[in-house]
């Protein structure tokens, strides 16, 4: 069903949600399934948590998932969303609130009518800067680490900066990119955890991967995503030294940049810029239509020409 659902992202895939449930889930969880004439056309997992004196239903995956939604078959989105909201709100004795986070503007769950007797609040939640990648980006130029430069439509200053960074790296050694496989997955994740931590330690902060349960989750999720062909994990090396790692996903003509880490001792090489340039090149070469930087308004995202795309929060409560 996930593969047939046009709007479902990697954050709705079983490879992401099953590890999330195992590492962070509540004992009280359930999955709603929608069927038409016996055929499965919709699925969405939830859990229940008490907050502000109310038992509240949340989608599985909150906190570390940048987009939340159901997996709905094409043409069934509106019907599935309406049926699921009606089912969730049919018995206020079980729970008194439903909170749907990180919904994209075109989500059927954002548009579905609120059941009678439930208040309905909708508000902008996050911004996900995104670069559009036209389908004809692939080219025959030769500036990139990958051997082509499909980024010729990026701002001129970005392309110039990439060339300068590559030239500086080449004066120090041989820069090359290692792509994930089953054989090197653990080594690349080790590099990601180490470089991400080193980068944040320069700011006196632990970084989001300091927690052991998060690292364990990402190891399990990455293995499942790799098996499904959704994982995009790149390591930039200078000779044999790993100097940057980028962790992302690709599905349904969209690249999702989830997390990265780079060596803070090589500012003259700008390893973060180099690995991002490679990821954009790889996304364009695969025919992706968008490069999504996901949540957060860090200035570097806009240097690549990213434009904000919002997500929405919808809160349903029984009574006024």
Regions picked out by a protein language model, each given a short descriptive name:
Residues 1-61, 93, 102-128, 132, ...:
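A conserved beta-strand-loop-helix scaffold within acyl/acetyltransferase catalytic domains
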Residues 62-67, 124-126, 296, 309:
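Short, solvent-exposed loop/turn segments at the edges of secondary structure
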Residues 76-88, 268-280:
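Conserved acetyl-CoA-binding loop-helix of GNAT-fold acetyltransferases
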Residues 88, 92, 225, 283:
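Hydrophobic pocket-lining residues that define ligand/cofactor binding sites across diverse proteins
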Residues 93-103, 283-294:
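Conserved GNAT acetyl-CoA-binding A-motif
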Residues 121-131, 308-319:
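Conserved catalytic-core motifs of GNAT/GCN5-like acyltransferases
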Residues 240, 272, 276-279, 283, ...:
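Hydrophobic, well-ordered secondary-structure elements that form the walls
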Residues 284-318:
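Substrate-binding beta-hairpin/strand module that engages nucleic acids
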């Amino acid at each position: 069903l996930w593969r047939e659902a046009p709007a479902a992202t990697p954050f709705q895939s079983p490879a992401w949600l099953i590890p999330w449930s195992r590492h962070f889930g509540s004992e009280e969880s359930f999955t709603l399934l929608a069927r038409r004439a016996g055929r499965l056309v919709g699925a969405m997992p939830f859990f229940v948590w008490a907050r502000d004196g109310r038992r509240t239903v949340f989608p599985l995956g909150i906190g570390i998932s940048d987009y939340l939604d159901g997996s709905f078959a094409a043409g069934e989105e509106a019907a599935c969303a309406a049926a699921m909201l009606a089912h969730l709100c049919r018995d206020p004795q079980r729970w008194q609130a439903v909170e749907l986070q990180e919904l994209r503007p075109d989500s059927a769950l954002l548009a579905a009518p609120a059941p009678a007797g439930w208040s309905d609040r909708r508000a902008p939640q996050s911004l996900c800067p995104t670069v559009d990648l036209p389908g004809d980006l692939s080219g025959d130029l030769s500036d990139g680490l990958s051997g082509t430069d499909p980024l010729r439509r990026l701002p001129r200053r970005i392309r110039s900066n990439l060339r300068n960074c590559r030239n500086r790296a080449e004066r120090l050694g041989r820069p090359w990119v290692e792509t994930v496989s089953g054989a090197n997955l653990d080594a690349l994740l080790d590099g990601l955890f180490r470089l991400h931590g080193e980068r944040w330690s320069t700011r006196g902060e632990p970084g989001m991967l300091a927690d052991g349960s998060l690292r364990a989750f990402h190891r399990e999720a990455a293995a499942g995503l790799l098996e499904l062909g959704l994982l995009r994990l790149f390591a930039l090396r200078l000779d044999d030294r790993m100097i940057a790692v980028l962790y992302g996903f690709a599905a349904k003509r969209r690249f999702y940049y989830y997390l990265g880490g780079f060596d803070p001792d090589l500012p003259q090489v700008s390893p973060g810029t180099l690995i991002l340039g490679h990821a954009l090149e790889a996304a364009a070469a695969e025919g992706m239509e968008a490069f999504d930087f996901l949540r957060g308004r860090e200035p570097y995202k806009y240097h690549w020409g990213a434009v904000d795309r919002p997500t929405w929060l919808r809160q349903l409560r029984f009574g006024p």
